[in-house]
């Protein structure tokens, strides 16, 4: 199981904001932007 890095930027707030954005979008979008999504969300998105 490959784990994706949460966010390259050290700011967590930015990561949360991006995770929210990913959460709102559909799976396909989330998959395409998995680099932007947080690790937890990416894993969830991947499972589905």
UniProtKB/Swiss-Prot annotation:
Its main location: nucleus. InterPro entries: Protamine_P1. GO terms for molecular function: DNA binding. GO terms for cellular component: nucleosome; nucleus. Protamines substitute for histones in the chromatin of sperm during the haploid phase of spermatogenesis. They compact sperm DNA into a highly condensed, stable and inactive complex. Belongs to the protamine P1 family. This is Sperm protamine P1. The lineage of its organism: Eukaryota, Metazoa, Chordata, Craniata, Vertebrata.
